[in-house]
């Protein structure tokens, strides 16, 4: 009699075979996660697929808690698992013990975790950024000794600002020894008393650029006292060195542009300053000319004697006062002498007279000396003021060969006020001349 198996019996037998096969107890699988779900219990459910096949999988909470990343839909992963059968559905599936991102994905995960850590510690804060000097004298360039990056940086700096001194510091930018070499070269550049440091290299994969994501490289850049421009990779490439540097440049060429001013723009600025200064000086001179012409038109300068007439009168008044004081003093002395003659006996009269004469003589000498000194000082002051007035006098100016130009009874102070065939009058030291303007020449033409 033929014996039939139940579905559950067959399923259990197949599961038994799977579980007894040592090749299925620990398999290494590479694939892409799909239909990923995290159950409220903490277990993970998903499919692992490649271009041709799909297999169901799950990971218990205990193993899932040990993962160093958060799995998600589309992740390329490397899995260590055992293969067995889920009896209830009769499906075979994998029970995952370990899981990690495959290759580049793992690097991106590591990069993201380190970025979050450094950001939390304040390494990327804008408040820590240093300003790039506008007019550097020395720039240190850290990059490979050959390649497009160094050529682009040097040629751009030479074209924009040839005055700056470039210090080339060759460094490894890729490979296992590059990390330590980059750190040492940055520290060396920081000791050279340069104004700016450019750290750069050409583009590449995340593996090629990884040395610029190393934590100790990032911290070396952060601790550098010299402003640093990071120019690692192309515009779409980002490294942690870009975030910690004072300025990030999309390319090595842009780094050179950021580090230097444009010599042609500077020349244009200098010309603008020169024009502004020249215009200001001309305006100032014109203003001073107008002030001088305005002052020279004062009535007192046309008749200089009015300036010192009062001084002469004041001097005469002082002289009169001094003479009056002197005469008064003499009269008082005479009166005093007379009283003395009356008060003393005849025997002492000659002696008293002699003493009074000496006193009067000394007093007279002192008064005469005071009066003479005052008169001399007044004459000196008057002479100095007369000389100052004569120097300002239009007449004295004409004595040195200058002439005053008048048109329609007004003084002409600029060639801009004259036209050809205008009738003018030239006033000189000994008379005046009528003339006709034949040609006008202006200094600013």
Curated annotation (Swiss-Prot):
Name by which UniProt lists this protein: Exodeoxyribonuclease 7 large subunit
Subunit structure: Heterooligomer composed of large and small subunits.
Keywords tagged on the record: Cytoplasm, Exonuclease, Hydrolase, Nuclease
EC number: 3.1.11.6
Signal peptide: none
Family: Belongs to the XseA family.
Protein's GO biological process: DNA catabolic process
Subcellular location: Cytoplasm
Reaction equations catalysed: Exonucleolytic cleavage in either 5'- to 3'- or 3'- to 5'-direction to yield nucleoside 5'-phosphates
Gene Ontology molecular-function annotations: exodeoxyribonuclease VII activity; nucleic acid binding
Enzyme class: hydrolase
A Gene Ontology cellular-component term: cytoplasm
Keyword flag Nucleotide-binding: no
Function: Bidirectionally degrades single-stranded DNA into large acid-insoluble oligonucleotides, which are then degraded further into small acid-soluble oligonucleotides.
InterPro entries according to UniProt: Exonuc_VII_L (IPR003753), Exonuc_VII_lsu_C (IPR020579), OB-fold_nuc-bd_dom (IPR025824)
CDD domains named in the record: ExoVII_LU_OBF
Lineage, top ranks: Bacteria, Bacillati, Bacillota, Bacilli, Bacillales
Short name of one Pfam family: tRNA_anti_2
